[in-house]
């Protein structure tokens, strides 16, 4: 599911510029699998399957794989189009230190939505 995340983010000059002050790792949970996404100055430098429970990011965003599949469709259904819309419906959870997420909210929302096909 994350096959093209790194390439899409790093190829988007406007997105990288917006995240130029972001250097951290966060956990992206897709179903039963957790991935550590490492960002250096707005560019994704690595995405790795978390193999130890002690490895974590600054914050985590988790949802079922079917939720992410819908989120990444070209035109997601209502409540699936945005991570903030998924939270009150119980479709996603966010934990950890939320300060860097909130300070760079549009950047992270765009990073997470970047696997979405743009063609409708």
Predicted regions and their residues:
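Feature captures hydrophobic
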Residues: 1-120
């Amino acid at each position: 599911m994350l096959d093209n995340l790194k390439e899409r983010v790093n190829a988007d000059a406007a997105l990288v510029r917006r995240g130029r002050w972001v250097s951290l790792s966060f956990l992206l949970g897709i179903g039963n699998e957790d991935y550590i996404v490492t960002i250096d100055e707005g560019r994704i430098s690595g995405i790795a399957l978390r193999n130890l429970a002690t490895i974590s990011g600054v914050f985590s965003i988790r949802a079922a794989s079917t939720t992410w599949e819908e989120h990444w469709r070209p035109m997601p259904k209502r409540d699936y189009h945005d991570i903030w819309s998924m939270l009150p419906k119980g479709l996603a959870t966010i934990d950890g230190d939320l300060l860097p997420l909130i300070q760079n909210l549009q950047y992270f929302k765009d990073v997470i939505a970047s696997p979405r096909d743009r063609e409708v």
